[in-house]
């Protein structure tokens, strides 16, 4: 399930990059339309409660996921695709810390060492001091932390709520929030036919990705499942070069390699 989710999220990154001429809130709103239309029908057919059981945690998870998506969409539109995805992949290490605090999953010195290795890799990608504009990088790091929080809450919800309910909360909460902000900003751009097709496809792929991610975290420990997120770096590098002619520099390549290696080492420790 996590491999399916990873493929979906990689495709989402490419589509968001393509849609970079549109406002981020507009992209976010369209991302949630299929979820808001399809999921309620599935819930009704399966006779599952629309509002779920753990409403507070469901809402918290939706807000964390939604704002992490907004941060991710923004950084994808203004940064090299591989760099944006690589920084986002620090989220598994935040997951380790949060899972230790809130879920009681063990953490030891080896994991701390691996975390430091990943952090060094992130520094090579970010290259602090090499450029003046650090705002996109800060947003990317914030997005990684929010992503970690959403994944940990997803793991916590496994005992109380159905995966479809979790996805439904995500779609409605963030669809309504992004629509409200879009109205407030007043910068809606009417998409052309191709952009509209990509926007709708983005929503469908996002729906599959969210469901697969939620199901994966209900089936396995957060630390183990999060390893597969690193595949996005590889997919992002390949797709960024093929579709957008974006070639990461040596610092980014080496930094991404360190993050992937540290993710693999963490995976081996868990097994």
Q: What do these predicted ranges mean?
A:
Residues 1-26, 132-156:
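Glycine-/small-residue-enriched transmembrane alpha-helix faces in small-molecule transporters
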Residues 1-7, 36-60, 109, 159-161, ...:
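Membrane-interface interhelical linkers
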Residues 6-10, 40, 62, 66-70, ...:
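Hydrophobic/small/kink-forming positions within alpha-helical transmembrane segments
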Residues 11, 47-82, 88, 204-220:
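Specific transmembrane alpha-helical segments of multi-pass solute transporters/efflux pumps
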Residues 22-35, 74-91, 133-146, 192-206, ...:
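Structural signature of hydrophobic alpha-helical transmembrane segments
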Residues 74, 91-113, 234-253:
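C-terminal transmembrane-helix exit sites in multi-pass transporters
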Residues 110-126, 251-270:
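Hydrophobic transmembrane alpha-helices of multi-pass small-molecule transport proteins
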């Amino acid at each position: 399930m996590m491999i399916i989710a990873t493929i979906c999220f990689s495709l989402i990154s490419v589509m968001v990059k393509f849609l970079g001429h549109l406002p981020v809130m507009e992209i976010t709103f369209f991302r949630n339309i299929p979820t808001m239309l399809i999921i309620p029908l599935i819930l009704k057919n399966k006779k599952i409660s629309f509002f779920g059981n753990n409403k507070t945690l469901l809402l918290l998870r939706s807000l964390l996921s939604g704002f992490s998506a907004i941060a991710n969409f923004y950084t994808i539109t203004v940064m090299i695709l591989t760099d944006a995805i690589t920084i986002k992949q620090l989220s598994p290490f935040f997951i380790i810390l949060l899972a230790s605090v809130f879920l009681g999953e063990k953490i030891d010195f080896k994991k701390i060492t691996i975390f430091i290795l990943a952090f060094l890799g992130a520094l090579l990608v970010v290259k602090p001091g090499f450029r003046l504009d650090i705002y996109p990088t800060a947003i990317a790091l914030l997005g990684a932390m929010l992503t970690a929080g959403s994944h940990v809450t997803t793991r916590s919800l496994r005992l109380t709520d159905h995966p479809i309910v979790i996805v439904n909360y995500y779609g409605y909460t963030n669809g309504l929030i992004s629509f409200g902000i879009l109205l407030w900003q007043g910068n809606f751009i009417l998409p052309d036919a191709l952009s509209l097709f990509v926007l709708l496809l983005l929503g469908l792929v996002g729906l599959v990705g969210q469901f697969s991610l939620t199901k994966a975290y209900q089936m396995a420990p957060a630390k183990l499942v999060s390893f597969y997120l690193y595949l996005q770096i590889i997919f992002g590098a390949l797709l960024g070069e093929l579709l957008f002619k974006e070639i990461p520099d040596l610092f980014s390549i080496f930094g991404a390699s360190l993050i992937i290696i540290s993710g693999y080492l963490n995976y081996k420790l868990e097994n």
